[in-house]
Amino acid sequence: MSEPQKKKFKSSNFIDELDQKRKNTASSILNFPFIKKRVKVLSAVDEVAKNSKGILYWMFREGRVQDNWSFLFAQKLALKNKLPLHVCYCILPKFLDATLRHYKFLVESLEEVSNDCKDLNISFHLLHGTPNVVVLDLVKKHKMGALVVDFFPLRVPSGWVEDLKNSIPKDVPLCQVDGHNLVPCWVASDKLEYGARTIRGKINTKLPEYLTEFPPLIKHPHDSAFKIPTIDWKNALKDVQIDRTVDKVDWCKPGYRGALMELESFITKRLKNYNTKRNDPTEDALSKLSPWFHFGQISVQRVILEVREYKKQHKESVENFMEESIIRRELSDNFCFYNKNYDSVEGANAWAIESLNQHRKDKREYIYTRDELENSQTHDDLWNAAQNQMVREGKMHGFLRMYWAKKILEWTPSPEDALAWAIYLNDKYSMDGRDPNGYVGCMWSICGIHDQGWKERSVFGKIRYMNYKGCERKFDVKSFVRKYDGKVVNKKNDISKMFKKK
């Protein structure tokens, strides 16, 4: 693959420039060499029945219109069979520990998706309920000829897909597309990988084939045969059963256009410092794109295509960003796809489980309840500041996420409590919670996955250790603590209180 030439960013026409790139690639998905290995046919049939009334794409992980392989594949089927194209999204009554913060970000972006679909003569349906019920109803009611679904390796959405596989009409193909990873998860590797070093080569050898420009999703030439219900966006969240005390954050604008604004900001302002300053929580050097990645509002592949055009100016920064955004991110999907215990201590390697068990009864110098952790009530002002950042902004600097999770292991009664509480707090407050990257981050910090055994010590065993003094050597801790009001709560602990009878 030839290296892109040096480029100067032109922010005024970024959206138009991307549209032109797609048009220059192909006139539509029908004229594009779509890689069939991106798709898994989950049903016994793979042909669209002649009496079908449309093609349906159930959007879940990939919440965008353009640069979406799932949507493009659905349009390919619809164009080939001369059928209307429909897309639906299901507003769940509850999803793990998602809060109003996440649901508002989602719904505002879906309104943008709906408007974009309208411009392209594609029918958008906002459904309420669990997908294995309401998507199936839509397929049956309107005689959809095929159902296209996103790949998402987490347990709950995978269960919905399995239910649909078992209940969808026998003559309706069910196709799953990995539009999230550059190299589809099942293509990158057919097994659970030990770490980045074992999957890196497998992905990099396949990148030249998969890291291509996208064709456009075009205005659809076939009209829907039935009227689409009007969407009441103001009341879209009226009946969801979520925590409404955790409200939206202001720094990230929902949707594809909001994502492009953040990408533009990263390329023009922060990319040059990514290599040297990305591990310093007091510096503004990260992409900040993880909320949009998680909700699928921008394609990681699109971001890589744009960022790598600046490799001549910022070689090390671009290379490191690609390592984090491709290798590390796709390693997380690999872990969750091939390890059913991706959010449990049981999912750790044997050496880590043995080591944690050997130190299970070690005395903890400090111990906290989940509520105390959630409310930043520890003796550690840096930890409290990091927790405050996550609660207020819906994000935490990557370096501090490691320190934050490891201290939870140090200050809780058991590894099981530590992992459960870290996942709960991350899922509740982080804009990118409930994501393979989040689970893997907690599992790396607490259970040593994708890592090796280190010098043995109390509580941690052979799990990699991090401490306050190490952070002081890395960055200006006092500055970060001041910014996020990290107050010390002097609380010398007596572990015995955790086991007193009530």
Label every PLM stretch briefly.
Residues 58, 175, 200, 264, ...:
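Residues in well-ordered beta-strands of folded domains
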Residues 70, 109, 113, 259-266, ...:
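Alpha-helical packing segments of well-folded alpha/beta enzyme cores
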Residues 2-214, 218, 317, 388, ...:
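Trp/Phe/Arg-rich N-terminal binding region typifying the photolyase-homology
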Residues 10-19, 51, 184-186, 190-351, ...:
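Glycine/tryptophan-enriched, flexible segments
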Residues 280-481:
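Active-site-proximal binding-pocket segments
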Residues 31-38, 65-80, 96-102, 121-128, ...:
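Phosphate-binding glycine-rich loops and adjacent basic patches that engage nucleotide phosphates
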